Amino acid sequence: MQHRLPHSPHQQAAERGPVGPDVEARLSAELAAMVASARRRALRDGDRQIDTAHLLHTLLESDPEVREAFESGPQVARLLGYLVQRSIGYGLRWQSSVEDSGAVPTVTGDGWSPVAAGVMAAAYGRAVRRGDPFADGVDLLAALVAEPESRAVEVLGRAGVDVRELLVRLDGWRSGAGVSKPEA
């Protein structure tokens, strides 16, 4: 039996934990579309909750600026190749479990994993700190990478991404400046 993710604003606010209309209203239009895509991906995968791997997968597919944050095109291709294996490989052990770092209360309903909910709030906080009222894809990627217990960080590590180096590059990012690349 597949579980359906909530679609009405009332259900979403009631069931998905700390990510509510306030945070989702503060996403850029592009990031809001990406979140909707991650929600569809979770549903298609038979998952009750959007987790950080769903968010990472959708970010990599849809945001060119996020792809620029990585060392190379082959690194992005390796990541995407790993992420598409979720339903037949590594992700099978995640089915019927909740992504929970232990730092936040576990949410048992449909919607957002506790870690993904925290990451969404952190992405918005990052946008506010840089003076933007809307979080974008790079804000979300930085928040994902900064959460060491996330499934996204596990995927990044398994795909050979140096998570600390990526976080340093993302921490240097400023609106309009793009992501700073390491010197070759």
PLM feature segments, named:
Residues 1-184:
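Histone-fold recognition with a strong bias for associated Lys/Arg-rich disordered tails
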